[in-house]
Amino acid sequence: MIILHIGLFENSFSNIMKSVIFQETAKLKKPVPAEKVIELSDRLLEPSSHSKRYPPRLHKTWGTIFFMIAIHLLSLVALQPQFWSMPAVTALFFFYWLTACLGVTLGYHRLLSHRSFVVPKWLERFFATCGAISCQHGPIDWVGLHRHHHSFSDTEVDHHNSKRGFWWSHMGWMFKDVEALKAVPKLSADLIKDPYYRFLNKYFLILQIPIGLCLYAIGQKLGVGGWALVLWGIPLRLVVVYHITWLVNSATHCWGKAPFDSGDGSKNNVCLLYTSPSPRDS
């Protein structure tokens, strides 16, 4: 029976991969030269035809601060002995794989931001949904900010400029108004056209509710306690995924080796190679 299930999985995965079209890797483009940064950045901040459909806005910084404090405190609660169990650990690793590997790395980053490959629309939306469950914002904002970062990496208009220090590039930038969000309507114009992506961008936080309800029910059914699975599957998992993702923006721009000039401070970091979901350009 186990062999049969494995065979069915392999056939299904094989059929999906046949529909994937890998694009020829684009040549590495260096960030905009320093003397042109301000001029080009200002152009991106000007209102575009997509601004009415997706009005640019700045972060509600206090909301971000309170959310981060709450999620980190809850992750500490999850580590209390009474919440440890194999089902809880399994929930963490499963949702880590679903959100960090499939959602952020494969979906938000490789597929939507860089268009490294092409998949059927339903599969693209599945990956985007997994990314939204990571609670790193919806696909429109994530992709727009990432494309902005690649255009102006480690310059004064880069929202997580590593030259401002490890803390700033790791998470400090989120607690200030992010001017780069004004450029999102232009940089994510291809995603704004899709109403499903606009939905994910607006309601990504709410996706945690059905997940929490399912985890609670499973925990109660297994007899390990519903809150154990909820705490490990949501707040603790979010904190783990957050910091591993952020280390790509901070640690790989501060420590490591640069075998060639990329035009910014990005480096190859061996530690991140084994801790991040997969090798990613930063």
Enumerate the language-model features and the residues they cover.
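Conserved small/polar residues in nucleotide/adenosyl-binding loops
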Residues: 274-281
